[in-house]
Amino acid sequence: MASFSFFGTIPSSPTKASVFSLPVSVTTLPSFPRRRATRVSVSANSKKDQDRTASRRENPSTFSSKYAPNVPRSGADILVEALERQGVDVVFAYPGGASMEIHQALTRSNTIRNVLPRHEQGGIFAAEGYARSSGKPGICIATSGPGAMNLVSGLADALFDSVPLIAITGQVPRRMIGTMAFQETPVVEVTRTITKHNYLVMEVDDIPRIVREAFFLATSVRPGPVLIDVPKDVQQQFAIPNWEQPMRLPLYMSTMPKPPKVSHLEQILRLVSESKRPVLYVGGGCLNSSEELRRFVELTGIPVASTFMGLGSYPCDDEEFSLQMLGMHGTVYANYAVEYSDLLLAFGVRFDDRVTGKLEAFASRAKIVHIDIDSTEIGKNKTPHVSVCCDVQLALQGMNEVLENRRDVLDFGEWRCELNEQRLKFPLRYKTFGEEIPPQYAIQLLDELTDGKAIITTGVGQHQMWAAQFYRFKKPRQWLSSGGLGAMGFGLPAAMGAAIANPGAVVVDIDGDGSFIMNIQELATIRVENLPVKVLLINNQHLGMVLQWEDHFYAANRADSFLGDPANPEAVFPDMLLFAASCGIPAARVTRREDLREAIQTMLDTPGPFLLDVVCPHQDHVLPLIPSGGTFKDIIV
């Protein structure tokens, strides 16, 4: 008999589930009516769909208003129509006193669906999951005061990771601003440094222009979050909207990057032809240029190391050219390549401290070429020998064209063989503990059973790093994780947003028990919306990364890293199966390695949401590890 416990009924599935016996009685769970299908049909990797969406926005020939041209309507209705005109068809909005007018207007929309999160932070993380997986801006709405404050982590996360996001907040009426009125917070001031831009709407006539500007800012150049704060009396005020108002962004428009000069691209290619040990160091800025990057690698034969945010921009399973992830928890061979390279091609990256370690020692033998769309990133942390401020996609297209016309013979086979020797000498590996389940093995199995094609979200901690190491992403926008901010609680709501943006896709939240419980309330949203989100819970009853750092840097002195019940430390606490059951979601627990494959297959075969609680040992560490501020010579394997 399979030794994993199961709670909940498994709905009938067109795909035959693995047969197993239930060692516990089955709890009958309530059935929920199926919600209307999402209108979003954007594939995680479909540029054509994204282009169609972009062309649909602001197009009078395709947009039809339900209002006659000269009919006054409320500011809230103008706001909702402005969203419709931008192609928005789903928002994540939680109502409150200062935003109820907007919610009432949403009920009058024929095209926008609201997904009601159970917490505003869940809503903004869901909007991020939607945006990260589709490339379209995610939209979230919250009320004033505490509702707006609950968006702060999500705004900072979107800014760090360059995610296009529009956050709309209700505000107290204009006459009450600055009086410490009930549920008043100065959200514009609070979020000024964690948004790309923000607005306080003081005139109803400005709504069409502000919304248009917000979408342009959120999606152009380096994407990011924009906040629009709308006082309640502005929402209630009636006006005839002017949809032809021009944007007022003269300074921003004057700094837009220009196409790269051919002479600059030829200079880079001369450096490539002169080098013996070149390495591509690619980041999140390459997610929209995956095809061009692959072609560049075909033409040059240069090996590719990816940042945490760039995973999937080049296929991780291409063992001839992919070095997988570099940095603090990157592979030995990726970090070796950077250490001994003579040319570092840094495309769409920001030389983050988790990649570079000690800046002076990073790529110290190499000439550095930095291409990025954001001029403020060039030279900020590491001074390049050659830099080009432009869209990476345009730069790659230009270099590919030059290479195809020249037909130069570039041979870096000897260098790749040297790196392959490092791969064989220092592969990603992990310990086994008898019948216990290594978390890395669980992720490897998931990769195998999904053929590396699932959309993966994570929380933050050890499980996040293991997912980055052991799941082999094939395409961009498969990997959704809080990178720069490192916000726990991200995984579950992000999976919710990804499932809505990508109907039919397999979406799995690989989470840790610490991160998962921070937004566990979104299980209710997932069930009510009937979203097929799978949760692979790596449950070691600890804050694993904190415990690991305690072991390495604090003489293993334990300080609040245990999450279980001190009175009964051997028990699994809290019981995640009961949380799932309370929301009507099937769930199972697996404790033995030999049962894991069947358990994961059952999770994948079960229609709708499913939670698989994988009980793991807590003693393992994420390796390799380059300590913070360290160098390649300090790597722990």
UniProtKB/Swiss-Prot annotation:
Binds 1 Mg(2+) ion per subunit. Binds 1 thiamine pyrophosphate per subunit. It catalyses: 2 pyruvate + H(+) = (2S)-2-acetolactate + CO2. Residues 35-69 are annotated as: Disordered. FAD binds at residues 222, 329-350, 372-391. Residues 462-542 are annotated as: Thiamine pyrophosphate binding. It comes from the Eukaryota. Acetolactate synthase is the target enzyme for sulfonylurea and imidazolinone herbicides. GO terms for biological process: isoleucine biosynthetic process; L-valine biosynthetic process; response to herbicide. Thiamine diphosphate binds at E120. It is found in: Plastid, Chloroplast. It is an enzyme of class 2 (transferase). Pathway: Amino-acid biosynthesis; L-isoleucine biosynthesis; L-isoleucine from 2-oxobutanoate: step 1/4; Amino-acid biosynthesis; L-valine biosynthesis; L-valine from pyruvate: step 1/4. Keywords: Amino-acid biosynthesis, Branched-chain amino acid biosynthesis, Chloroplast, FAD, Flavoprotein, Herbicide resistance, Magnesium, Metal-binding, Plastid, Thiamine pyrophosphate, Transferase, Transit peptide. One of its GO terms (cellular component) is chloroplast. This is Acetolactate synthase 2, chloroplastic. One of its GO terms (molecular function) is magnesium ion binding. Residues 1-73 form a transit peptide. Residues 46-59 have a biased composition (Basic and acidic residues). Mg(2+) binds at D513, N540. Belongs to the TPP enzyme family. Its cofactor is Mg(2+); thiamine diphosphate. Its EC number is 2.2.1.6.
